[in-house]
Each structure stands twice: as C-alpha cells, then as structure tokens.
C-alpha cells in the first residue's frame, strides 16, 4: 500500500527552501489552496490504488454476493456474516470480516448500499449491505443474463496477463494479447475451453440485453424480408428479431465451426462462410459489435462485401458504440474509452470509432447515405444505405 508522507514540522521544509535560495518553490507551495491540493492528492491516491475495485468486483461475481443479497428480497440489507453463511462450504472463520471489507469498498463505488447499526453487546457497529441501482446489471435477470460474465472475462487471467505486454507493444509494435499468448484472441479461444466459455457467455449476455432494447426502439426492421446477421454466432440475436418480426427470413452467417453448434431456430437459416470472402444476399444486413473487432482495412473488406450482397436501396444496420471526439468525464465516455483501449490490447486491430469515422468507412465502401438512427443502451444504431 502507498504510504502517505508526513512531516513533524512542515515549516522546516519551507524554511530550508528559503535558506537554499529556492524561493520560487517556496512561493509556489505557499500560494497553493490547501483544500484543493488535498483533493488532488486524494484523487491521485485513488488512481494509484485502483486495482482492488475491479478484482473485488470479480470475486463478488464469482461468489454471487450480489445474488445472495437479491435473493433476500427487495430493499433487504444483509450483514457480512449473513452473506457468509449463504456461501457454499465457507469454512473460513475470517470470511465475514473479509466480506465486510470487500462490500465496504463496493459501497464506496455505489455498487451496494450500506447502513451501519449498533453492534450491541459486541460493541462497535454492524454494517448491513443492500443492492444499489447499478447492481441489478450484475445479477442474473429473467433471461438469465447479466454483465457479471463480462467482468469475469476482462479480469480473467487471459486478458489480465496481456496488459503486461502493453509497454512493449507501444515501443515495438504488435498486439499485447498476441505477444503474451503467441496467437490472436479468436484462435486462443480454441485452446482454452474455460476462456472460450466465459468469452461466449459474456458476449451472449450483453447481446441478449441490448438486442431486446434495440428491437423495442429501432423501427428499421419493418418491411425487411431477408435479414443477414453477419457474425451472428449461434443465432440468438436473430431469434429475438424474428420473434418480434415473424415475416423476416433470418440468415445467421458466421464461420463454419461456429454455426455447427447453432440450435434450430424457427425462421432462421444458419450459413457458414468467411465474411472477408463473401456475404449472403439479403435486402438488409445486420452487424452488432463486429466492426470494432477489426482495423479500418478489414472493415472496408467486410463493408464492400455487404455492398455487393445488397439490392439497390438496401441497407446495413450497424450497432456500435460511438467514440466521443473530445474526452469527457461521464460514465459513458469512460466506458467507451476503456473498451477502446481494451480492443487495442486484446484484438487484431480493433477500435472504437467516432461517428465521423463510421461515416468515412461507409462512404469509402460505396454507400450513398449514412444515417445515425437512435441511441440504445450505450450503442448507436446506424444505417449505411446503398
């Protein structure tokens, strides 16, 4: 842990600066607003000590701490001892104390609520913890999905180890993930079953959550007869779309080794192939969180193949986050920037793009019109019109 510097007599340092002729340093120090300087130091210390939060979140997901609190009922708060009692085979007598310290940290980030009550005969206080509004996204909903798997993926060993190669990648080039593991992330999935399971779960959960919101808000699926989902995985996205628009014939397009595990879905045909070679014909093409995996050069190949597969007036429906051109300090801006640097570290040329960059890609691929339609759960639904 970082040690906060102290001085038995702060004026000694200032007097020494004056005696040594460093009056400029002395005057600068003397003129500082002590309260503002304290706040800056506190923020710097938070940055220096930020690793425990994501790691505690990962452990909370693995232990299902938030799920245990949720099971107790709406607005209920539980003590760390009560939560520890619900853990399987919790034989560690220190578990309640450890959980209390972890949950305290989560409370400082507004992930959980906390109420301190009188400890009675034991003295001190007993803290009870409940779910803050954001916590619902880390507890499985009625569809069995949450963002918990995304935390397990990003804080898992395979991705964490890659960050150790970031400095080397900046100085020498290359992708940190490839440098550490000796292969691209999509190839690595085939060598690590546990990583592959977590990766697929994280993608499925996030996609399930967002596609339902997209279908409710975006009206551009109307009048589509044949919709091709490029990189559609096991077809879950098309399942949601076609269940809301039964007249649509869905074509789930992905690599052959992916679609061979795809389940039978009414109204959906699974087609194997390579999007860099060709894409099945349709009057509309859907791509969600696909372009951000690839470099501009790769994206142009994909989009040009989309253009060839569309009739006149056909469209590509692109769902991606939009990078903000100037950095902001909002939660959304931070989330997108974090994902962007994550893509830089883990993927083969992937990046988050600004709206202007998406428009440039659309025009370079030959599309006549670029139309940002609506914003849904951190994502923009954009149409590239032929």
Swiss-Prot record:
Binding positions for S-adenosyl-L-methionine per the UniProt entry: 254
Description of how the protein assembles with itself and partners: Homodimer.
Lipoprotein as UniProt keyword: no
The protein's annotated pathway: Aromatic compound metabolism; Alkaloid biosynthesis
Catalytic residues (positions): 292
Major enzyme class: transferase
Function comment: O-methyltransferase participating in the biosynthesis of natural products derived from phenylethylamine, including mescaline, a natural hallucinogen potentially used in psychotherapeutic treatments. Catalyzes the O-methylation of mescaline para hydroxyl groups, using dopamine, 3,4-dihydroxy-5-methoxyphenethylamine, 3-hydroxy-4,5-dimethoxyphenethylamine and 4-hydroxy-3,5-dimethoxyphenethylamine as substrates.
Catalytic activity: dopamine + S-adenosyl-L-methionine = 4-methoxytyramine + S-adenosyl-L-homocysteine + H(+); 3,4-dihydroxy-5-methoxyphenethylamine + S-adenosyl-L-methionine = 3-hydroxy-4,5-dimethoxyphenethylamine + S-adenosyl-L-homocysteine + H(+); 3-hydroxy-4,5-dimethoxyphenethylamine + S-adenosyl-L-methionine = mescaline + S-adenosyl-L-homocysteine + H(+); 4-hydroxy-3,5-dimethoxyphenethylamine + S-adenosyl-L-methionine = mescaline + S-adenosyl-L-homocysteine + H(+)
Keywords: Alkaloid metabolism, Methyltransferase, S-adenosyl-L-methionine, Transferase
Family the entry assigns: Belongs to the class I-like SAM-binding methyltransferase superfamily. Cation-independent O-methyltransferase family.
Binding-site list for S-adenosyl-L-homocysteine: 207, 231, 254, 274, 288
KW Methyltransferase (keyword) present: yes
Documented EC number(s): 2.1.1.-
Name of this chain's protein: O-methyltransferase 10
């Amino acid at each position: 842990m970082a040690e906060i510097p102290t001085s038995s007599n702060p004026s000694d340092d200032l007097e020494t600066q004056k005696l040594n002729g460093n009056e400029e340093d002395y005057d600068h120090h003397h003129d500082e607003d002590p309260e503002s300087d304290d706040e800056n130091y506190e923020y710097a210390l938070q940055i220096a000590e930020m690793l425990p939060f994501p790691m505690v979140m990962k452990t909370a997901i693995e232990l299902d701490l938030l799920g245990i609190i949720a099971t107790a009922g709406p607005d209920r708060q539980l003590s760390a001892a009560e939560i520890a009692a619900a853990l399987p085979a919790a034989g560690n007598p220190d578990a309640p104390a450890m959980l209390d310290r972890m949950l305290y940290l989560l409370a400082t980030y507004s992930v959980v609520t906390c109420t301190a009550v009188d400890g009675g005969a034991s003295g001190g206080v007993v803290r009870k913890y409940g779910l803050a509004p954001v916590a619902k996204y880390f507890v499985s909903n009625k569809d069995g999905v949450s963002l918990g798997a995304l935390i397990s993926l990003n804080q898992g060993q395979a991705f964490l180890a890659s960050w150790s190669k970031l400095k080397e990648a900046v100085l020498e080039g290359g992708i940190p993930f490839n440098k550490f593991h000796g292969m691209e992330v999509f190839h690595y999935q085939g060598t690590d079953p546990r990583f592959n399971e977590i990766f697929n779960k994280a993608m499925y959960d996030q996609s399930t959550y967002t596609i339902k919101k997209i279908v409710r808000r975006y009206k551009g699926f109307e009048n589509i007869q044949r919709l091709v989902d490029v990189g559609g995985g096991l077809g879950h996205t098309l399942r949601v779309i076609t269940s809301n628009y039964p007249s649509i014939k869905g074509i789930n397009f992905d690599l052959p080794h992916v679609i061979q595990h795809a389940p039978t879905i009414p109204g959906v045909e699974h087609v194997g192939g390579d999007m860099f070679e060709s894409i099945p014909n349709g009057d509309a093409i859907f791509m969600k969180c696909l372009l951000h995996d690839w470099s501009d050069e790769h994206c142009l190949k994909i989009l040009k193949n989309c253009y060839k597969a569309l009739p006149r007036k056909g469209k590509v429906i692109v769902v991606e986050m939009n990078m903000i051109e100037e950095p902001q300090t909002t939660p959304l801006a931070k989330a997108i920037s974090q994902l962007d640097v994550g893509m830089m570290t883990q993927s083969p040329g992937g990046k988050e793009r600004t709206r202007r960059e998406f428009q440039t890609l659309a025009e370079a691929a030959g599309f006549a019109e670029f139309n940002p339609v609506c914003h849904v759960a951190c994502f923009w639904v954009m149409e590239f019109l032929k």
